[in-house]
Each structure stands twice: as structure tokens, then as C-alpha cells.
């Protein structure tokens, strides 16, 4: 699930949910192409599909720098809720009515019949089915 990430003091931090319309003029902190060309392309394409030209204030190269910039109030971000750590000093607000999405993949050898692998796969499937 995708959320808008803000500092604790940001005016939007107390909202129950946000839409693209709510954030269209907000300065954004984004992960650079170093995180993956395909990721970056999909991210920008989602803005296009949402009818928004993002106001990119800062590009950062890793998740720690990303969360730090947001927590310091340099801008807001969009990310999957699963990557936010409780120690990040940020607020995660669900983003509704957007083309932004998070894709996950898990790989394993099909001939591996260990019970722990099967249990883990069931856990992952159940978790992301929510």
C-alpha cells in the first residue's frame, strides 16, 4: 500500500488519508534513478497517469537519506508503508485514488520442499493479500 510520508509537524500529517489533489503543490523528496531505472520510470509514469506534474525538490540516493529529508521537513514523499520504520520520525498517510503502487516479488527454487519455505510463502501471500 502506498502512503504519503510527512514530517511530524507537516500540516497534512493529521489527515486520515490523502489524494493526489491534496499533494499536487507539495515539494517532493524522491529516490533517484540509482535505486533503479525501472522503479524511477514507473514512479514518474504514475504521476503522469494521475494528471500531476510533480514538484521535485530533492532526489536522494538511499532510503535513510530519504526519510531524514522528510523528517526534517524538506518535503513529503510517497512510499510503501512496509518500508517505514517506527524510528523514522515521520507520519504515513494512506494515498487514495492514485496510480502509484508497490510491487513485490519473492523467489525460491521450485524443487525446494522445506516446510519453512512453504510456511514463509504462505505468510507472505497472506500479508500482501490484505
Label each region the model flagged:
Residues 1-28, 118:
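Flexible hinge/capping segments at coil-to-helix
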Residues 52-62:
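Short beta-strand-to-loop elements that line the ligand-binding cleft
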Residues 1, 61-112:
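Beta-alpha-beta core module
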Residues 26-50, 117:
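Secondary-structure junction motif
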Residues 12, 19-21, 46-48, 82-84, ...:
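Short secondary-structure boundary/capping segments
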Residues 39-42, 112-126:
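Short amphipathic alpha-helical coupling segments at ligand-binding clamshell hinges
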Amino acid at each position: 500500500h502506498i502512503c504519503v510520508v510527512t514530517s511530524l509537524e507537516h500540516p497534512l500529517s493529521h489527515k486520515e488519508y490523502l489524494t493526489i489533489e491534496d499533494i499536487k503543490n507539495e515539494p517532493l523528496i524522491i529516490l533517484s534513478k540509482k535505486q533503479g531505472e525501472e522503479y524511477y520510470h514507473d514512479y514518474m509514469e504514475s504521476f503522469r497517469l494521475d494528471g500531476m506534474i510533480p514538484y521535485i525538490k530533492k532526489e536522494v540516493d538511499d532510503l535513510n537519506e530519504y526519510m531524514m529529508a522528510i523528517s526534517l521537513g524538506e518535503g513529503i514523499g510517497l512510499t510503501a508503508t512496509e518500508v517505514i520504520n517506527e524510528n523514522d520520525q515521520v507520519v504515513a498517510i494512506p494515498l487514495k485514488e492514485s496510480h502509484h503502487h508497490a510491487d513485490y516479488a519473492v523467489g525460491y527454487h521450485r524443487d525446494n520442499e522445506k516446510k519453512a519455505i512453504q510456511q514463509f510463502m504462505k505468510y507472505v501471500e497472506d500479508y500482501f493479500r490484505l
